Amino acid sequence: RDQPRSRGLGDVYKRQELYDLTTLQKEASKRYGFSPKQTLNIMQSLYEHHKVLTYPRTDSRYLTNDMTDTLKDRIKACQNGSYKKAAAMLLRKEIKASSRFINDKKVSDHHAIIPTEQYASLTSFSSDERKIYDMVVARFLAVLSAPAISEQLSVKASINGELFRAKAENIKQLGWRELYEEETQTKDTIKAGNIPVKGKEYPIGTISMTEGTTNPPGRY
């Protein structure tokens, strides 16, 4: 039988910033094991040969105000592959300049890395080029998408006199996190329709026990 559960206030997940070269290199290394030089070479190919991404050697994570009117054309250019749905949704609404990604003072020689207005022919990319291109497109669309809002849940359940506790995340609005679906869908994420009702009895599906040991904290 479920006991009273607590519901935390809605958390608004902070949207990540657009990529500069250093940040892109770090994330490509973490995700794919690419060296900084390898990522730069791939970026150079996507910039010079395919012409689908902007200049890579930048230390800015912002765009200039005069680029606002070009954003929809850039979205159209990457409206294919796994981002077709997200791009289509963005194209149906007005794209307004926001200080989250527009700041003339934080752009010196070159702005953040984003898609160009050149349509991307995904079949012409190598496997590594596709990985880097997808990273940039996902970040670009995420920055322009709606915020992600979730609610933290804490549930207590009594089974044969033993009290069990569980915590989970109830996603209220997926927003930009839809572009990172694999990272969003974890075992601790539940849908609103699956939230247990207070006081209601539920059948036990399976019971499993996980054994483990605790480790002492590090010396430093």
Regions found by a protein language model. Name each.
Residues 1, 32, 36, 124-126:
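RNA/tRNA-interacting regions in translation and RNA-turnover enzymes
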Residues 2, 27-28, 134-141:
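Phosphate-interacting basic helix/loop segments used at nucleotide- and nucleic-acid interfaces
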Residues 2-9, 13:
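Single conserved hydrophobic/aromatic residue that forms the stacking wall/gate
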Residues 14-28, 53-58, 216-220:
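Short acidic, hydrophobic short linear motifs in intrinsically disordered regions
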Residues 34-45:
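Short amphipathic alpha-helical interaction segments
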Residues 49-134, 165-170, 174-207:
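Extended, highly charged linker/hinge segments and catalytic-adjacent loops that couple domains
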Residues 81-87, 141-149:
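Active-site phosphate-binding and catalytic loops of NTP-dependent enzymes
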Residues 150-168:
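Long, charged, helix-prone linker segments
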